Curated annotation (Swiss-Prot):
Residues 10-116 form the MaoC-like domain. This is UPF0336 protein SGR_2883. One of its GO terms (biological process) is fatty acid biosynthetic process. InterPro entries: FAS1-like_DH_region, HadA-like, HotDog_dom_sf, UPF0336/Enoyl-CoA_hydratase. One of its GO terms (molecular function) is (3R)-hydroxyacyl-[acyl-carrier-protein] dehydratase activity. It comes from Streptomyces griseus subsp. griseus (strain JCM 4626 / CBS 651.72 / NBRC 13350 / KCC S-0626 / ISP 5235). It comes from the Bacteria.
Length: 150
């Protein structure tokens, strides 16, 4: 089923705030094998001009992908989640994510198209801190694979 083109430009409500903790940053850095000292040591982060530890660049994926899930679960869009794979991901940072940040994500559908029977949706996730400052924009491409022929 083709996706509804009228959804391009639709913006979803912001997510509840996610509080970024030092331990979550440490766990994430360890999980992805990133040993940069600024991710685990506040003194190392301060030496680089940050008030506290900062998160690896891909840390926000977990909260932006969860926010993109709101788009995917919208029954009116018509995306078959059972066939969805992650196609691409890009981040554009204004500043690093820091321990203590309280972040919300607002998702907007940037593009909807069909290609070779696959449905493709591009979602922009704008991540703001509690003051409303834009921290990072995540661009996520999701692909709902074409149904297999019997």
């Amino acid at each position: 089923m083709a996706l509804d083109q009228s959804f391009v430009g639709r913006t979803y409500p912001p997510t509840p705030a996610y509080e970024v903790g030092r331990e979550k940053i440490r766990e994430f850095a360890e999980a992805v094998g990133d040993t940069h000292p600024a991710y685990v040591d506040a003194e190392a982060a301060r030496a680089l001009g940050h008030a506290d530890v900062i998160a690896p660049p891909t840390f926000v994926f977990s909260i932006t992908y969860r926010a993109a899930g709101e788009v995917v679960r919208d029954p009116q869009l018509g995306l078959d989640y059972s066939r969805v794979v992650h196609g691409d991901q890009k981040f554009s940072y204004v500043r690093p994510v820091r321990a203590g940040d309280r972040l919300t994500v607002t998702s907007t559908i940037e593009a909807v198209k069909s290609l070779a029977g696959n449905d493709i949706v591009d979602i922009r996730g704008d991540v703001h801190d509690e003051t409303g400052e834009l921290v990072v924009t995540a661009l996520t491409k999701l692909v709902a694979r074409a149904a297999e022929e019997a």
